[in-house]
Amino acid sequence: MIRHIVAFRLRPEVTAEQAAALLAELDDFPRRFPAMRRFTSGRNTSTRDDRFTHAFSVEFETEQELADYLAGEQHETFVAEVFRPLVEERAIVSYEYSPSEGDIMTAPARQHAPYGMEYARIEVPDIQATIDFLVYHVGLQLEQHTEERAYLRADIEHHSIELISAPQREVGHTVAVGFSVESIEVLSTLQKRVADAGFEILDLEERQQALCGEGFATVDPNGLVVELFTDFQEYAEAPHVEIRPLDLVHPFLVTDNFDATVAFYQDVLGFLPSDHVVGSTTFFRSEDRYHHSLAISRNRDEGTFVAHLCFAMKSFDHVMRMRARALYKGSPIASDLVNHSASTSIAFYLHDPQHGPRFELCDRHRVFTPEEQETHRPRRMPADPRNIDVWRPAADDWGRF
């Protein structure tokens, strides 16, 4: 832990009202900066040294969290516009210490979500056809392949897509999603929250158990298996393929059980809302700080399912090269170039139902700063196509999504 202490003396001309306003704003810091721990403040009561009139003390888990707080725009604005005009002198001390075992006051101010999405498990009727589709059109690299199962990866993570041969299916269907978790401690907390909320705790899929550290699975209100784990296996190098995704960013869920689904992912798993399209969709972020690592949309008379998986490409040029491949092969582009209002990414969507959900290939998906991660307030945008794709010219232009 890092303890940060600031002692200060107010200027003689500062009024009681000004002093009270300053101290009230300081006391509001823990709400505005959730990374803070054990914030305390007060008037100096020392009989040995009365040089400073007030002080406050706060703790952070890491030096980086302290640095992010000090460099953040909110903090710098407060210091320049509120603190310095009223303070004549100050002293600052920061030091590292080890908290006592069992000290519950060092717990985070907010519950942590999973870190980020790692993979989707998809059952498909023709596994070889889907492998060929994902290699050519998405840029994934095939790593392991049997008649029953295949693993494909985007970057160094063991896999981004796991395919299961299901010849009895007419179309592909996503049966599970996997999210990594930062630590055993966070994983244990997540498992307790899931159990306390009345959801069943399951073992990870047998093969997945061998590919990670600790973990567990549960089932969301729609029947989708959610696997949570630490220490996902990695390759030493990324695939030696120039045009490929860098990361699997998020799943987009469509559900006829919207409220219960939102409650599960937000209240139980701890995902943070980033933006709302009112009456339609909520975008959630996790600890990897993407604008959204999960999106949940109300049923549009299409059933309940994983509607798409988003992959981040290296550049807009690579997005367009993949689009050119789709046009060349005559592969269906379900939704052409979209300039997203929420994530600021530009993307297009491929969809051949036999291979499962739509595959979104995007560039420049917004990543929050550490300060934004803790302080961002979600927008409430009306259900207007221009609040989904800012290139749409009119409020009734709902086609082509």
Task: List PLM regions with ranges.
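Core segments of cupin and vicinal oxygen chelate
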Residues: 20, 112, 121-159, 209, ...
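Vicinal oxygen chelate
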Residues: 92-94, 103-110, 116-125, 168-244, 247-256, 282-285, ...
